[in-house]
Swiss-Prot record:
Gene: PHACTR1
Protein known as: Phosphatase and actin regulator 1
Domain remark text: Binds three actin monomers via the three C-terminal RPEL repeats.
GO molecular function terms attached to this record: actin binding; protein phosphatase inhibitor activity
BP terms from Gene Ontology: actin cytoskeleton organization; actomyosin structure organization; cell motility; cerebral cortex development; dendrite arborization; regulation of neuron migration; stress fiber assembly
Location of this chain's protein in the cell: Cytoplasm; Synapse; Nucleus
Bias (Polar residues): 335-345
Function text: Binds actin monomers (G actin) and plays a role in multiple processes including the regulation of actin cytoskeleton dynamics, actin stress fibers formation, cell motility and survival, formation of tubules by endothelial cells, and regulation of PPP1CA activity. Involved in the regulation of cortical neuron migration and dendrite arborization.
Matching Pfam families: RPEL
Disordered, as annotated region: 331-355, 376-410, 462-494
Residues modified to Phosphoserine: S67, S78, S467, S505
Disease: Developmental and epileptic encephalopathy 70: A form of epileptic encephalopathy, a heterogeneous group of severe early-onset epilepsies characterized by refractory seizures, neurodevelopmental impairment, and poor prognosis. Development is normal prior to seizure onset, after which cognitive and motor delays become apparent. DEE70 is an autosomal dominant form with onset in first months of life and variable severity.
PROSITE patterns to which the protein is assigned, alphabetical: RPEL (PS51073)
Length: 580
């Protein structure tokens, strides 16, 4: 017997293999008319088995019409599943009716947060972070390995280069940083041929002028040490380290270059001295005259200047000329006795020495490192006075005289206290003079002639304004100023006097006022009686009342209520004390 082939039915072999007769019947009953029509096309063995069984009396639930083809496709798909229970459950879930049958399992509803796992996946975040960290660290390592040298950065223009003659001078930029991240802040001046030489370290103190001595005229044991100029506690150092200006004046000519290195770390000294700003006039004075009074050849006038350093030296000369006279006066006012180091400047011309290993002859020139104090107003006066070298020299002298430690400590602490308390005098001594204010263009610089001209201009302005004021006649014409004679004024005064005397003569006496019950003073309103003085706060008169007193008060109050107080007729029944 040939069975018709229909694409929406399963083949018979798979139906035999997957289902027994009962489950197939159950499924086809649940699928409606189209599924029931499929039972006619089953093989005879299947039909016989189904006729022998009892007929299923369950009500048939019809869900869709005959034209609904997708359900046939769903039936075909569901036959491929493993068990008939799965088929039945799927059919119940596909149906629009949510009421489960007697044999259908309950519908499994999906959770509210079923879709949350698609969007929100926090278990992957840690992995992403660690991967990101690995990527960034790898990129940083790659950048560090690809870092360029100083010469390449100078070629690219990242670092500035001041001049290149025999030696190269280059100022390190902010971008040229150390390996640990700290940026180089000091200016560096280096020779490629003399890279092995030890640089001369300068103290870290930001407020000291230092003169580097010529290497050939040193007689002391410390040939490379800088000579510290004596200090004056007049200009106090700003709290932050200011900008440095290097004055380099090579002696031999343009082919000789200066080797100096400015390091930030100072040597470990016994006493950490903060030097005050050395005055520029003192620098000139100390360059010309040594510590022992011996005359040195003047360096600023005779030395030829390097072409690239001309601008800096011009600026320095301007500042020297600007502050010369004021600083000389302050020098006379506050003398300070300080001593040079053991290695002093000696007289004599600078002689060039041949360097080691056949290097070209190099002459060390006196180099002045000057700090530009841009912020003179924000000055910690007391702390600088505490650390001034004058106090330290006094303490050293006391120690040399072998005085008691306690007494020296007491005197030094007393001196510190006096210096601290004298801050007003320090501030007054640090006030800038008129000339300095004029030089800073804070006060306008004026000669006597300019001052006189300004006064004359102000005078002419005032006279012109006074001449523009209206005269008395104009004011009279405008009816602002009324014309008056002396006789008229006298008459007005007499009239006022007459009126006042008439009023005073017509004033009633106190008795008349009392008769009219017009009282003047407060005592006229109040009856005065003598009373005993007692503590009114502590006194509680109701505690002294007896039961009879209380009853009398109550009776009086009730009578007053019943007779004097008016009560509305509608609320009279609410009162206890109404008239009978």
């Amino acid at each position: 017997m040939d069975y018709p082939k229909m694409d929406y039915f399963l083949d018979v072999e798979s139906a035999h293999r997957l289902l027994d007769v009962e489950s197939a019947q159950r499924f086809f009953y649940s699928q409606g008319a189209q599924a029931r029509r499929a039972t006619l096309l089953l093989p005879p063995t299947l039909m016989a088995a189904s006729s022998e069984d009892d007929i299923d009396r369950r009500p048939i639930r019809r869900v869709r019409s005959k034209s609904d083809t997708p359900y046939l496709a769903e039936a075909r798909i569901s036959f491929n599943l493993g068990a008939a229970e799965e088929v039945e459950r799927l059919a119940a879930m596909r149906s629009d009716s949510l009421v489960p049958g007697t044999h259908t399992p309950p519908i499994r509803r999906r959770s509210k947060f079923a879709n949350l796992g698609r969007i929100f996946k926090p278990w992957k975040w840690r992995k992403k972070k660690s991967e990101k960290f690995k990527h960034t660290s790898a990129a940083l390592e790659r950048k560090i390995s690809m870092r360029q040298s100083r010469e390449e950065l100078i070629k690219r223009g990242v670092l500035k280069e001041i001049y290149d003659k025999d030696g190269e001078l280059s100022i390190s930029n902010e971008e040229d940083s150390l390996e640990n991240g700290q940026s180089l802040s000091s200016s560096q001046l280096s020779l490629p041929a003399l890279s092995e030489m030890e640089p001369v370290p300068m103290p870290r103190d930001p407020c000291s002028y230092e003169v580097l001595q010529p290497s050939d005229i040193m007689d002391g044991p410390d040939p490379g040490a800088p000579v510290k100029l004596p200090c004056l506690p007049v200009k106090l150092s700003p709290p932050l380290p200011p900008k440095k200006v290097m004055i380099c004046m090579p002696v031999g000519g343009p082919d000789l270059s200066l080797v100096s290195y400015t390091a930030q770390k100072s040597g470990q000294q016994g006493v950490a001295q903060h030097h005050h700003t050395v005055l520029p006039s003192q620098i000139q004075h100390q360059l010309q005259y040594g510590s022992h009074g011996q005359h040195l050849p003047s360096t600023t006038g005779s030395l030829p200047m390097h072409p690239s350093g001309c601008r800096m030296i011009d600026e320095l000369n301007k500042t020297l000329a600007m502050t010369m006279q004021r600083l000389e006066s302050s020098e006379q006012r506050v003398p300070c006795s300080t001593s040079y180091h053991s290695s002093g400047l000696h007289s004599g011309d600078g002689v060039t020495k041949a360097g080691p290993m056949g290097l070209p002859e190099i002459r060390q020139v006196p180099t002045v490192v000057i700090e530009c104090d841009d912020n003179k107003e924000n000055v910690p006066h007391e702390s600088d006075y505490e650390d001034s070298s004058c106090l330290y020299t006094r303490e050293e002298e006391e120690e040399e005289e072998d005085e008691d430690d306690d007494s020296s400590l007491y005197t030094s602490s007393l001196a510190m206290k006096v210096c601290r308390k004298d801050s007003l005098a320090i501030k007054l001594s640090n006030r800038p003079s008129k000339r300095e204010l004029e030089e800073k263009n804070i006060l306008p610089r004026q000669t006597d002639e300019e001052r006189l001209e300004l006064r004359q201009q102000i005078g002419t302005k005032l006279t012109r304004r006074l001449s523009q004021r209206p005269t008395a006649e104009e004011l009279e014409q405008r009816n602002i100023l009324k014309p008056r004679n002396e006789q008229e004024e006298q008459e007005e005064k007499r009239e006022i006097k007459r009126r006042l005397t008439r009023k005073l003569s017509q004033r009633p006496t106190v008795e008349e006022l009392r008769e009219r019950k017009i009282l003047i003073r407060f005592s006229d309103y109040v009856e005065v009686a003598d009373a005993q003085d007692y503590d009114r706060r502590a006194d509680k008169p109701w505690t002294r009342l007896t039961a009879a007193d209380k009853a009398a008060i109550r009776k009086e109050l009730n009578e007053f209520k019943s007779t004097e107080m008016e009560v509305h007729e509608l609320s009279r029944h609410l009162t206890r004390f109404h008239r009978p």
